[in-house]
Amino acid sequence: EQQVQALFKAWFVDFEPFKDGKFVDSELGKIPEGWKVGRLDEIGEIVGGGTPSKSKAEYYCDKGIPWVTPKDLSITHAKFTSKGEVDISDLGYKNSSTQILPKGSVLFSSRAPIGYITIALNDICTNQGFKSVIPKIAGTAFIYCYLKNNIKNIESQATGSTFKEASGSLMKSLKVLKPDDISIYRRFEEVETSLFEKQAALEEENLRLSTLRDTLLPQLMSGELKIDSLNR
């Protein structure tokens, strides 16, 4: 993860690949000539979520549409997510304001708390505790790194009396750098993709091992499973 963030900083904070060019002043400081300061909703689509009625059991199921809440991420702290604790049914989806987010979308928890970030491994939807970003011009890696680097900035602009929330309008209006050549986004994505793939594979293996541990440990503790049987 440190390498992922270091690359983002090198490209879009320190501008190391562009040091030989001319720099100009902007509201975000010195930037390469030709680059512009835009909005987050110019490089990605900001999408909210929703919760089907909890009083309707038929709106929830074990194998339906993956549905994620901030609580799920508070447990897993996963960078990549395929599902939450419970899925919603087609009926639940039709009767709520949640929306399907395609693979590669970046999920950002916008309240309670602000700042959980995860990447969708498949089509997925969320509750209203998220303002997610579907990549358009920029790719998944750029948007993920951008949000990671702007959590404190987003928190400082969040509003609310009971608890702070980053609204959809706030997320859409976040300032973001737009290179004069948008292929720079693509080149950055190509560099980061291999790192992301390795991270996803490691997370999957760690999940498999922890699931195996949680299955075997109670059996060993109860005497239902003997250590000798594991060595055969």
Task: Please place each PLM-identified region on the residue numbering.
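Proline-centered turn/helix-capping motifs that create local helix->coil transitions or kinks
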Residues: 12, 16, 75-78
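Non-catalytic DNA-recognition/assembly elements of restriction-modification systems
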Residues: 1-7, 13, 18-51, 67, ...
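DNA target-recognition domains and sequence-specific DNA-contacting regions of bacterial/archaeal
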Residues: 31-32, 36-179, 231
